[in-house]
């Protein structure tokens, strides 16, 4: 290799120039090809949305040179840059394949534990991603053979790197600067509210640019405090002098069980949808005995915490600039005024129950400030665990809730977020919709069993189920 490294070709400044100039273009192409899985579609997008590809290439160029000035050697800067964007390409491909949702900046805030994310994925071999990896590796080897170095002392290199990073950061995060950038390059910076609106934006931007737009959206979702806002003002608006006080001794405090059922939807409302007979029979039986209606949630295909936030605070995320992860807007180490907090003040024992990892979305850290006496995740379950596919089933969670109510003195408030019917829905012997609807049927059956057991309990209990 040393002989090859010293050859006229790899020692030529012209060769160095060509490899350095083409690197961002090459990485841009490999990144988009990996997630698009079609050379013809990539070429068509390049010709029809040329400005987008130019912006993506310039962004890669900025990151490439930002790293280069820090590490001095171009092949190391190239390796770091290529690894970053190849990882983005793989994440986008597999995430969209499994969930139908695109990779966004907010996804990076979902978990501090990468192992949590792998539980959602059923990875399969992809020849084009493997080919891209080999081509990228070959290019990095060529950069190593060129051995391009920035011959400047670190203070100078560090200063230049800082300038590149600073200019790039403010260009992406400051709305007044990002808006004209979008105009120049034809970027679709439409605000995305869910997977459907993001799909339309992604078609116009592709992976790299859409990810950059999601960075700007994350920053601009910051909420500003209204003028003259104060706790006293809110309390004065809520006070009702005409309401007669109720004697505490006359109040019956039933257990409150709040169930947020994973990925539940009534597919009978979709035109042309062939739903197997009996799928929702148990749900219909439950509705005959209960008050029921339709619920509208602020998310689809991901970001469960958006719905959780609305149900815990009674506050629509739309009022918070549709923040992707609304609890990220809250100040740290401050007790939050949630429904759990309200019930706790009324003498309830409060529990949050979610049979998944405590680190996902940072729930354990954040929800400890929501007024819950106890947080229970998958490692905290004390009843025998059963699973549907890869996740703890609803029956296990309901029996855990029953155990909590039996062991505590006084009334309980339990917020349950289930996991049973979470994606992926892939199966060798059924369609994704078929697998999903089988999970729905099981969810309905196990909810009815839970309600029937509660009817036999001596403790009065109200169940609110978001289905």
Language-model features: where?
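Transmembrane and membrane-interface helices of multi-pass
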Residues: 2-201
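Short, well-ordered coil↔helix boundary/capping segments
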Residues: 81, 104-108, 205-210, 395, ...
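Membrane-interface micro-motifs in multi-pass membrane enzymes
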Residues: 99, 105-106, 195-208, 298-302, ...
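Short alpha-helical interface patches
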Residues: 99, 106-116, 128-130, 210-218, ...
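Alpha-helix initiation and N-capping motif
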Residues: 108-111, 204-208, 231, 280, ...
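Membrane-proximal soluble helical/coiled-coil segments
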Residues: 119-122, 128-129, 240, 246, ...
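Membrane-interface segments at or immediately adjacent to transmembrane helices
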Residues: 175-258
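Solvent-exposed soluble domains appended to multi-pass membrane proteins
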Residues: 241-254, 260-261, 266-467
